[in-house]
Amino acid sequence: MWTGWWLWPLVAVCTADQFRDNAVRLMQSTPVIDGHNDLPWQLLKRFNNQLQDPRANLTSLNGTHTNIPKLKAGFVGAQFWSAYTPCDTQNKDSVKRTLEQIDVIQRMCQLYPETFLCVTDSAGIQQAFQEGKVASLVGVEGGHSIDSSLGVLRALYHLGMRYLTLTHSCNTPWADNWLVDTGEDEAQSQGLSSFGQSVVKEMNRLGVIIDLAHVSVATMEAALQLSKAPVIFSHSSAYSVCRHRRNVPDHVLQLVKQTGSLVMVNFYNDYVSCKAEANLSQVADHLDYIKKVAGAGAVGFGGDYDGVSRLPSGLEDVSKYPDLVAELLRRQWTEEEVRGALAENLLRVFKAVEQASDHKQAPGEEPIPLGQLEASCRTNYGYSGAPSLHLQPGTLLASLVTLLLSLCLL
């Protein structure tokens, strides 16, 4: 009897090791696709995006949640890198700043070709898996980055953007952010304005994943109901587990289930436990809850590494993913469910977005009304001279007659 008692700790250790061994085995063939990492923002803050700076060497970078050895230890096989610029750039230099962050992501791939493979589609992710590299994709974090322009949206797509978060923690002129739900911001669009609906439709047409992290509940509902393709929450958790407005409420999780969409769980302590402290088990609680409400196909990982100041014990950096997967296995997740959360759910959503795209369809052209824009740092070219599509026929004809007279054609 006493001999058995002394063996209990050994049995527990062996069992724990078995779960982690199984996690590693699974991740060797199905590495994790993480929905959101802010390493590019750290490269801007620390080194002004100068990757040749010896201190910025990603094989030995210190003081960040992410570097190349940590990515390899964590079996990260694909990463949506955040091209983020803060809300105070809105109506100023947000487009320039976004372009610079896309550029630094692309230069990461050029400087470390043995580690990173910049890709723009689901097939590229699978190619990177086969080559043992980290598929690197661009996620633009905040609708203010397109400066309320469908033309800029299209240009960012052509530069590699494959998801756009409709807002950051600020309203755009066409979509509301999560602070509306706390009362700290006032609703401007009641979810999505008419132009916001045009943005969603153009993203569907192009094949850009719609990301609803950071948006208000009304914006979540509007986008989920309007989009022809599944959407993602690239770094959000479950509101019923932690009642923080950055998390996803149950009725929206039902819409996620109905639309085949995806919630990629955020690891930030404040969203995990609603406290300054959190642990790995509490992150698993969010994964369990989303699986329970929306189904195993609705679960993914969006750690928000290098974008947050506090992380759970046991998930201190990107190398810790196998420990979280081991916890899911301990909680009797099936291997199929784990592979889904690791990668297959995101690949399914990405493929559905690609299939719903239609580049033969005419692109959206109607601009946002000038009156909805803050005018202090912008010109009004196009608005003052171009006839509106909403003019009455008689008014439009009069405008054409005036134009033809000026050209001496009448």
Curated annotation (Swiss-Prot):
It comes from the Eukaryota. GO terms for biological process: antibiotic metabolic process; cellular response to calcium ion; cellular response to nitric oxide; glutathione catabolic process; homocysteine metabolic process; inflammatory response; leukotriene D4 catabolic process; leukotriene metabolic process. Pfam families: Peptidase_M19 (PF01244). Glycans are attached at residues 57, 62, 279. Disulfide bonds join 87-170, 242-274. Keywords: Cell membrane, Dipeptidase, Disulfide bond, Glycoprotein, GPI-anchor, Hydrolase, Lipid metabolism, Lipoprotein, Membrane, Metal-binding, Metalloprotease, Protease, Signal, Zinc. Gene3D superfamilies: Metal-dependent hydrolases. It is found in: Apical cell membrane. It is an enzyme of class 3 (hydrolase). Substrate binds at residues 168, 246, 304. Its EC number is 3.4.13.19, 3.5.2.6. Belongs to the metallo-dependent hydrolases superfamily. Peptidase M19 family. This is Dipeptidase 1. It comes from Bos taurus (Bovine). The lineage of its organism: Eukaryota, Metazoa, Chordata, Craniata, Vertebrata. The gene is DPEP1.
